[in-house]
């Protein structure tokens, strides 16, 4: 956007800012209802309800997050991933790889679980209780409470604020399991687990002692139910690292290599094979190719990449997307 065109927007932005200020000051925030759309997630093989909020509500989301970001980031642990800058699937994968390969004696036993219907299960009253304890600014509490009350139930998938609230809420469980669970032997404190990683509501605990990891998992489950009013899915697993890979974030992580999850591999393979050797690739497939490529780039997949000539296909896909972006600007 040219400087002249940008300057024309300044009076409008100034007017909107004043209106928002008055709404907050007078406790009269008015927002249109969130529209919900059901979308199928092919990777998870489930239908997700995505909330699409008004532009005005999105502005309030950014106001709330920017004002509270320092507090959110102080609470959210380093090994809580998803929906945070530079802390996505690759970050989580690399952390687990480092743990199981540099010090496998501390990762002999794995507990893996995920929270049952996490987003819709977050109690509005309960999360407000935590926020009230951590935020002392009454205006900010009013804004966040108002935004939370617009959600049909729990938190809202698709909301910028909800991404931070989700990680913030689970941070209490993370700190509990990593800092509060230990045994004392001969006057020395020994943590029940050595490592923990939360990929949003997917949870993994790693330790050297089966009994200790099992106890930590049980106490974590009790904490979630009592303090966060959440439950784990009954499909949670406790297993030795040498018996199977850690299947998480789209990867299968072994103690000696990492591969792509079978379902993702099959979906990606269809797209790669369909476009192998093509000079013209559709825009839809181009986006898929770039999306899937990351999984193969960071796994034990060099032979496969060479077999399907993925580097050449990727180059064409990037050109297609680049040309599409330029055409929109023009």
Model-derived features: positions:
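Inter-domain linker/hinge segments that demarcate the starts of reverse transcriptase
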Residues: 16-26, 216-228
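Conserved polymerase palm-domain catalytic core
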Residues: 23, 97-200, 204-221, 239-240
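Conserved pre-motif C helix in the palm subdomain of viral-like polymerases
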Residues: 45-77, 152-180
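Right-hand nucleic-acid polymerase module
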Residues: 53, 58, 62, 68, ...
């Amino acid at each position: 956007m040219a400087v002249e065109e940008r300057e024309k927007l300044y009076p409008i932005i100034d007017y909107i800012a004043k209106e928002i200020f008055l709404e907050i000051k007078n406790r009269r925030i008015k927002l249109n209802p969130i529209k919900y759309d059901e979308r199928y997630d092919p990777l998870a093989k489930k239908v997700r309800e995505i909330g699409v909020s008004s532009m005005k509500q999105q502005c309030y989301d950014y106001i709330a997050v920017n004002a509270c970001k320092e507090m959110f980031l102080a609470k959210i642990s380093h090994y809580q991933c998803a929906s945070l800058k530079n802390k996505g699937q690759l970050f989580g994968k690399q952390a687990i790889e480092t743990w199981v390969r540099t010090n496998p004696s501390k990762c002999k036993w794995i507990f893996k679980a995920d929270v049952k219907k996490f987003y819709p299960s977050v109690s509005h009253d309960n999360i407000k209780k935590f926020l009230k304890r951590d935020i002392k600014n009454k205006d900010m509490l009013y804004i966040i409470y108002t935004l939370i009350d617009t959600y049909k139930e729990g938190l809202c998938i698709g909301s910028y604020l909800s991404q931070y609230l989700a990680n913030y809420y689970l941070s209490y469980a993370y700190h509990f399991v990593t800092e509060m669970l230990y045994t004392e032997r001969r006057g020395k404190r020994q943590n029940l687990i050595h490592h923990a990683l939360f990929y949003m509501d997917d949870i993994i605990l790693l330790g050297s002692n089966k009994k200790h990891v099992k106890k930590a998992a049980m106490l974590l489950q009790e904490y979630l139910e009592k303090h966060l009013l959440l439950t784990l899915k009954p499909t949670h697993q406790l297993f030795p690292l040498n018996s199977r890979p850690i299947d998480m974030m789209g990867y299968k992580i072994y103690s000696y290599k990492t591969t792509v999850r079978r379902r993702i591999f099959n979906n990606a393979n269809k797209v790669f094979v369909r476009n192998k050797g093509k000079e013209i690739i559709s825009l839809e497939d181009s986006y898929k190719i770039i999306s899937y490529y990351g999984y193969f780039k960071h796994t034990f997949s060099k032979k496969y990449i060479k077999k399907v000539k993925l580097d050449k296909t990727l180059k064409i896909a990037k050109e297609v997307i680049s040309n599409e972006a330029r055409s929109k600007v023009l």
